[in-house]
Amino acid sequence: MKKFLPLVLLALLSPAFATTVQNLDSVPSAIQHPEGKQIFAEQMAGATPAKGFGELPQGLSEKQWIAWVAPNEDPDNLILTGAKSWGKDGKYIGIACFADNKADAEQAKKYADNTCPENYSNGRANKLYLGVFSWQNPQLTPIARSEKPLNQLSEWNKAAEKESDDESVRPLAYYTKLDLAPYRIAPDTLAFGVRGGYSDAYSGGGAFYEVLELYTIKDSKIINVFSNLVYYYSDIAGDWNKDGTRQHNISESKYILKMRSAKTHGFYDLERVNLQDKSSQIFRWSESLQRYAP
């Protein structure tokens, strides 16, 4: 079987924007992309992330929602719920995030930041469930659900576990938002995105990785069909200045996903483009894997 480099490693081989600034105050103006500016604001100024998962539609209670989307989870372990309108006909994509126990859930909610946060006992994201449903009249009509938490469905996690010997490549440690751009991967198939990531902390800074996962509906189940790095940001402290401030080395890489007109097995090929040097990588549908592969 042909062996591929881990997806993150492939991403980091691509050229990145890099610059050095003279002190911490100069970092925000050196960051090129809004993702990095938000990371800096959260890390250095304590800014709260936006509600990337939205809110349940008016009239839909948390109790009713989690009874369908995650029937085997204990309601006492709930951290977060949310939903966003998707397309027409009253369709929504919703989430429910659970901790392993009530104490961990209460601790997570105490420091609530609108994300499905890290489970510090295993270094992974807490249990995030997805559901697609219709809400009209008002009544919940089920369409599809993930059945398992995303950290078990994620192709990114599987690749990170099985293929990587790079210590910087890890399973996702948190989920941040729904990405409902119109990812039409086939004429009759619309996918939706979930964004998450993980970070590395250094004595003089850190690195942050954002991953886009695309999910689609197959029968009444939600399956992961694509996962890859879409943003990388690092801030590493450098030399000391005479005035006691310290230089900072900033690096960024950002990628966008394009749907190509060419098809493989009925699905449009995906092109991930590096915005820095316009290099790209093509992903095609694999019938055997039932997802995209490089």
Predicted features along the sequence, with ranges:
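Sec-dependent N-terminal signal peptides
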Residues: 4-13
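Acidic, small-residue rich beta-repeat scaffolds with periodic aromatic anchors
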Residues: 18-87, 205-294
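Acidic/hydrophobic-patterned starts of short beta strands in beta-sheet-rich repeat architectures
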Residues: 87-100, 184-199, 262-271
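Short consensus segments that form the blades of beta-propeller domains
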Residues: 107-124, 201-207
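Beta-propeller blade signature
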Residues: 123-135, 208-219
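Surface-exposed loop/turn elements that mediate protein-protein interactions on large endomembrane-trafficking
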Residues: 133-148, 217-227
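Repeat-based blade/solenoid architectures
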Residues: 152-159, 163-177, 235-237
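Eukaryote-skewed repeat-based solenoidal scaffolds used as protein-protein interaction platforms
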Residues: 170-208, 212
